[in-house]
């Protein structure tokens, strides 16, 4: 037996939340032909088109560092929190809709002069990345 999976589509509000923009922005993109919609009512955005647009948006973020690196997972964002406790520090970076948390030495946090509002690049190099999907 062949298994045919229905194409994933998203409501405008879901697409907006996933892209970190307002519903109105998604509607404008639809009106401008940037995002297609399926023939359903209310309008739904095909998942593959939404994914392609998410990649375009992500590549628009300027990486302020002038470094070459083997790490490919780079999150440009703003430091939102620095909590120093003894010899360790927790630094939170908000990169679009993504919150990246780093644990580092308090000395490193001070040397980097990290504080809320600082521009930073969270660089992730991992040997394991777990992918999850919602159950249907």
Segments predicted by a language model, with ranges:
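Major-groove DNA-recognition helix of helix-turn-helix-type DNA-binding domains
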Residues: 19-42
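Histidine- and aromatic-rich ligand-binding microenvironments
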Residues: 30, 35, 49, 123-128
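Short helix-start
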Residues: 36-58
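Polyanion-binding surface elements
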Residues: 3-21
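Mid-protein regulatory/catalytic core that forms ligand/cofactor-binding pockets
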Residues: 65-136
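Short boundary/loop segments of OB/S1/cold-shock single-stranded nucleic-acid-binding domains
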Residues: 52-71
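Short beta-strand micro-motifs in enzyme catalytic cores
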Residues: 8, 43, 89-91
């Amino acid at each position: 037996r062949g298994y045919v999976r229905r194409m994933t589509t998203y409501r405008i509000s879901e697409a907006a939340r996933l892209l970190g923009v307002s519903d109105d922005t998604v509607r404008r993109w639809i009106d401008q032909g940037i995002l297609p919609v399926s023939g359903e009512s209310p309008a739904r955005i095909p998942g593959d088109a939404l994914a392609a647009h998410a990649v375009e948006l992500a590549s628009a973020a300027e990486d302020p560092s002038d470094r070459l690196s083997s790490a490919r997972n780079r999150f440009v964002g703003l430091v939102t929190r620095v909590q120093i406790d003894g010899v360790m520090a927790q630094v939170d970076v908000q990169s679009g809709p993504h919150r990246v948390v780093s644990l580092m030495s308090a000395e490193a946090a001070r040397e980097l002069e990290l504080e809320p509002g600082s521009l930073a690049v969270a660089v992730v190099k991992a040997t394991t990345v777990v992918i999850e999907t919602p159950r249907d």
